[in-house]
């Protein structure tokens, strides 16, 4: 993805998930979104090559980590399958992204021929893309969810730095995309982080706040799904007003006040844990992303 890279290692003989690793996308320093990265390739003669080199090196390292966790070796790796937005797939395969930058937003390929440039001698296959801004991650998601086999209309959402939507069923889908911004990936949020170890991924209320953490252990921050969950729970508990204001303790329900403090502007700051909090600015960033 634009913000996060996740690798899952499977034993295909028995279908077992052997290990999972994730990290910030190594290209993040070149731009928070795909438009910034496309621009980088247009402004520098070696831009595309540099971005390709960064992401391929990162995937190689993450695969090494995944294999180590599973006590497996590179010699056992038979195939690498990648699904991502169209720009990310192009950059990994060392292809030009100039055509995606302007009307009619035509990519060099939609990866209908899935074979890509091998990584360390291991064959690489890409999920087929739909268009310049509807990538192989959407195709993979529709297949994995089973929506392609269902009657009637169903809405599939991929909410991240780029937001894609697909509406339809077994007779086909209509797809579109929007630049939703990095908030859904935890970027620009005071305690935000990608969906990697330590990220709060789900929040719920059950006589108190309960949460799930990616990889287990102590929470370090909020990823996109955790941010959405927390905002929904706070709205339900009347800590966030209908218009989106995060209330200070004196305006919030009595049972919620121990999690709140007042900021310098008269709004609330909510503390899920001593290390993980939500500010009024975070709520606003989420509203803008939506």
For each of these PLM feature ranges, what is it?
Residues 1-27, 153-171:
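Gly/Thr-rich phosphate-binding beta-strand-loop-beta motif of the actin/hexokinase/Hsp70
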Residues 37-64, 77, 89-158, 164-290:
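Helical "lid/coupling" subdomains associated with nucleotide-phosphate turnover
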Residues 72-78:
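Membrane-interfacial loop-to-helix junctions in multi-pass inner-membrane proteins
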Residues 13, 31, 64-68:
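Phosphate-binding active sites in nucleotide-utilizing proteins
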Residues 68-72, 147:
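Secondary-structure boundary motif
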Residues 83-87:
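Core structural elements
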Residues 28-34, 91-92:
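Short acidic/His/Gly/Ser-rich catalytic and metal-binding motifs that mark active-site loops
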